[in-house]
Amino acid sequence: MTTQLEQAWELAKQRFAAVGIDVEEALRQLDRLPVSMHCWQGDDVSGFENPEGSLTGGIQATGNYPGKARNASELRADLEQAMRLIPGPKRLNLHAIYLESDTPVSRDQIKPEHFKNWVEWAKANQLGLDFNPSCFSHPLSADGFTLSHADDSIRQFWIDHCKASRRVSAYFGEQLGTPSVMNIWIPDGMKDITVDRLAPRQRLLAALDEVISEKLDPAHHIDAVESKLFGIGAESYTVGSNEFYMGYATSRQTALCLDAGHFHPTEVISDKISAAMLYVPQLLLHVSRPVRWDSDHVVLLDDETQAIASEIVRHDLFDRVHIGLDFFDASINRIAAWVIGTRNMKKALLRALLEPTTELRKLEAAGDYTARLALLEEQKSLPWQAVWEMYCQRHDTPVGSEWLESVRAYEKAILSQRG
């Protein structure tokens, strides 16, 4: 296999060199693009605060595949297993409900100490951490409102939760030497026709301003805000709409989060990246796969995933775009879900790096759209798979579908023993 891989690699280098692409440079650039894996795929967004509680906020994890992580130790072990099968740099994205404490902790009282184990684990595994306040699955979010709540005391609770979360995020960045991107998403909205659409947005605006009022070192912490079209139970009105957060991120110069599943099914976030970059300093991407709605299916190597990666690479947005994943499928092996989705994101980035973009730009500028289309299509047939397999080998990760054997062995030895 190694001989075949090396032969394919040498031939691929020649093929790409013929169109002006240095594959070694492409692999070096790929190592500059970490993908932030989301912890919540491992336990269906249960968390450790109240793991038997129901998931709320208009989101759903469907399926009942056996072996989900039941505590932090199991979740970290599962993550390590997945990460061993994914080449290149990675980060981990945590939600506040994944804190660890011997006694119950109110969400407005979370502290860095409740995430110390995650930081030590991240250090040991050379990972950066990202963070999210958890404004769902809680008695004070049960009526569908959090940061835009009309009740001052409830709204203040969620403001304090987000402020506490920012301090946790800054702790991550300080300890790990890489800024933590903290994304604020809230489920606030209404099921049916809404008469007053303005007041909740006014309250959300003021609440967010209070949340980000404490100045934190941008070398440690980055604020991001995330819109959504609708959620289950909030079909008619979402307070934090695209227009609201685009305006907020632009006026406050925070990062803007674009989630692939949070728009109308005919919209794609790949087309929004270049527009948003004109107005906001940084973007956070939640790469997902919506099937008819924000279903959070496992990411495929499909046209939209490729288009997202191509936008990042074509416009040299390496230092301004943070790539995160957001899906949770409980109907398949959860470790396999991580591996499939993350490897697909990295494959898309590699394919983008292997594109003869300079030549394509020249053709476009010259108005030769025939040649542009022809070259775009022909480059799809170039042997990028051989380059990917070499990348996997250099990072001591399985080539092709060999990783599935490792997942099956782990499932038999570990996952099958869980209740």
UniProtKB/Swiss-Prot annotation:
Its cofactor is Mn(2+). The keyword Transmembrane does not apply. Its EC number is 5.3.1.14. The lineage of its organism: Bacteria, Pseudomonadati, Pseudomonadota, Gammaproteobacteria, Enterobacterales. One of its GO terms (cellular component) is cytoplasm. It comes from Escherichia coli (strain SMS-3-5 / SECEC). Mn(2+) binds at residues 262, 294, 296. Pathway: Carbohydrate degradation; L-rhamnose degradation; glycerone phosphate from L-rhamnose: step 1/3. This is L-rhamnose isomerase. It is found in: Cytoplasm. Catalyzes the interconversion of L-rhamnose and L-rhamnulose. GO terms for biological process: L-lyxose metabolic process; rhamnose catabolic process.
